[in-house]
Amino acid sequence: MQFSKMHGLGNDFMVVDAVTQNVFFSPELIRRLADRHVGVGFDQLLVVEPPYDPDLDFHYRIFNADGSEVSQCGNGARCFARFVRLKGLTNKRDICVSTANGRMILSVTDDELVRVNMGEPNFEPSAVPFRAIKAEKTYIMRASEQTVLCGVVSMGNPHCVIQVDDVDTAAVEILGPIMESHERFPERANIGFMQVMKREHIRLRVYERGAGETRACGSGACAAVAVGISQGLLAEEVRVELPGGRLDIAWKGPGHPLFMTGPAAHVYDGFIHL
């Protein structure tokens, strides 16, 4: 099986063309391939499949390193767009793909950055899903014998955003896994730790569902900005500084889609016998 190794700001992926190859990935195989000692090593596996609808270009599937399938990955979407162009699967600059929960438009710019229409953030608890009586801008939760104030949103996957004074000293390794599996998130959640530098600039660390802390999380950056705007903390255009680098997020507010712009890097191509 042929594959490519790619990354978006250090969030790394194994990308596989299932348009011209017959492939099947069991959870056991994914976990073995994800192992950085005996496999390829990656945060997520991205699979390019033929479209299910003639109006679409491809179907986009995402698997975490633990073998679970998820419905959204913003950094992966940028790598997906670069991959299908690099491999000659399309020469379009605007690529329309389906995911497990909807559609996305991926636009490759002249300088090879990728702009992704991530859709409109959804703050309804049932959409996240999150156990709450009604939607709130800020929720009070108990975790590890402490009170946590957070915002909750779906970007096609569940996100919880916690504002902190300093991301460098935030208890990501302790609070991340506790909040990820909190009983109020029936499908678990991605946990963002956001430091507001000014209205146009935040710093962010993300503990990803099924992957742990990664160097960058595209949908996490989108979620942090969406929550920050909803809470009146941020402007419509925000620079997000992650451990792996920078993303630019733009959202005009309710009724509008959110856009993410950032790089996607091809590392190498490989072949593996399964």
Curated annotation (Swiss-Prot):
GO terms for molecular function: diaminopimelate epimerase activity. Pathway: Amino-acid biosynthesis; L-lysine biosynthesis via DAP pathway; DL-2,6-diaminopimelate from LL-2,6-diaminopimelate: step 1/1. Substrate binds at residues 11, 44, 64, 74-75, 157, 190, 208-209, 218-219. The active site is at residues 73, 217. The record marks 159, 208 as: Could be important to modulate the pK values of the two catalytic cysteine residues. Keywords: Amino-acid biosynthesis, Cytoplasm, Isomerase, Lysine biosynthesis. It is an enzyme of class 5 (isomerase). GO terms for biological process: lysine biosynthetic process via diaminopimelate. Its EC number is 5.1.1.7. It catalyses: (2S,6S)-2,6-diaminopimelate = meso-2,6-diaminopimelate. It is found in: Cytoplasm. The record marks 268 as: Important for dimerization. Its main location: cytoplasm. Pfam families: DAP_epimerase. GO terms for cellular component: cytosol. InterPro entries: DAP_epimerase_AS, DAP_epimerase_DapF. Belongs to the diaminopimelate epimerase family. NCBIfam families: DapF (TIGR00652). Catalyzes the stereoinversion of LL-2,6-diaminopimelate (L,L-DAP) to meso-diaminopimelate (meso-DAP), a precursor of L-lysine and an essential component of the bacterial peptidoglycan. Homodimer. This is Diaminopimelate epimerase. The lineage of its organism: Bacteria, Pseudomonadati, Pseudomonadota, Gammaproteobacteria, Enterobacterales. The gene is dapF.
